[in-house]
Swiss-Prot record:
Residue ranges of domain HTH tetR-type in the record: 13-73
Pfam families referenced in this protein's UniProt entry, alphabetically: TetR_C_24, TetR_N
Protein known as: HTH-type transcriptional repressor KstR2
GO molecular function: DNA binding; DNA-binding transcription factor activity; transcription cis-regulatory region binding
Amino acid sequence: MTPPPADDTSGKSGRRTELLDIAATLFAERGLRATTVRDIADAAGILSGSLYHHFDSKESMVDEILRGFLDDLFGKYREIVASGLDSRATLEALVTTSYEAIDASHSAVAIYQDEVKHLVANERFTYLSELNTEFRELWMGVLEAGVKDGSFRSDIDVELAFRFLRDTAWVAVRWYRPGGSVTVDTVAKQYLSIVLDGLASPHN
C-alpha cells in the first residue's frame, strides 16, 4: 500500500517565517524604499521569482511583519490594562512590555518607527492609525487614573507625560541591541527608575 504524501505545510510555514525574518532585517537596515524584492531574494539565496510563490508583493511582507508584531503587543497591552493592577504597576507593566517587544521584535519595531508616517497613507495600512489611537487611549487612561488616585503627581501635564513616555521608550530601538551586554530587563528597570523616581538623590 502506498503511503499518503507527506504534509509539507510546516516546512512551507517555516520557510515563510525565515523569508519574513530576512526581509524584516533588510527593511530595518536599509528602509522599505531602498530594499528591493531582489535584495530579499539574494539574501535568502533564491531567485526573485521564487519569492512570489510566498508573497505577492513587498508590501504584503511589510504588512505581515507589522501585523504579527502589533497584534502580539496590543494583545499584551489590553491584558495589562484589564488586569486590575494599580496605576503605577500598570504603567510599569506597559513600559516593560514595550521594551520586551523591542528585544523580541527589534526589526519590526525599527520598521514601524521609521516608516509609519509613510505607511498610514496606504489604504492597506489604515489599521496603523487605529492602533496609534488605541495606544494613546490606553496609556493616557493609565496616566489620568494615576493622577486621580494619587499614584502620580497632580501637577503633571498628562499630555506631555504621555508624549515623553511614548517617544523616550521606543527610541531605544536606535541603540539597544538584543543579545548585547545590557539586557532588556536592565534597560526597563533603569528607565522606570528614572521616570518614576527621578535622577536626583533624596535630600537628607
